[in-house]
């Protein structure tokens, strides 16, 4: 397992999580993305 890939992947999921959080706190975006915002 390549540690550098793991770090890059962690970084990407971190960014995704931030983007999802930002989207889900925006009613319009949350409404358009009910599958990720619950």
Swiss-Prot record:
InterPro entries: Conotoxin_a-typ, Conotoxin_a-typ_CS. Disulfide bonds join 23-29, 24-37. It is found in: Secreted. Keywords: Acetylcholine receptor inhibiting toxin, Amidation, Disulfide bond, Ion channel impairing toxin, Neurotoxin, Postsynaptic neurotoxin, Secreted, Toxin. Alpha-conotoxins act on postsynaptic membranes, they bind to the nicotinic acetylcholine receptors (nAChR) and thus inhibit them. Residues 1-21 form a propeptide. Expressed by the venom duct. GO terms for cellular component: extracellular region; host cell postsynaptic membrane. Its main location: secreted. It comes from the Eukaryota. The modification Cysteine amide is found at residue 37. PROSITE patterns: ALPHA_CONOTOXIN. Residues 25-27 are annotated as: Ser-Xaa-Pro motif, crucial for potent interaction with nAChR. This is Alpha-conotoxin-like Qc1.6. Coiled coil: none annotated. GO terms for molecular function: acetylcholine receptor inhibitor activity; ion channel regulator activity; toxin activity. It comes from Conus quercinus.
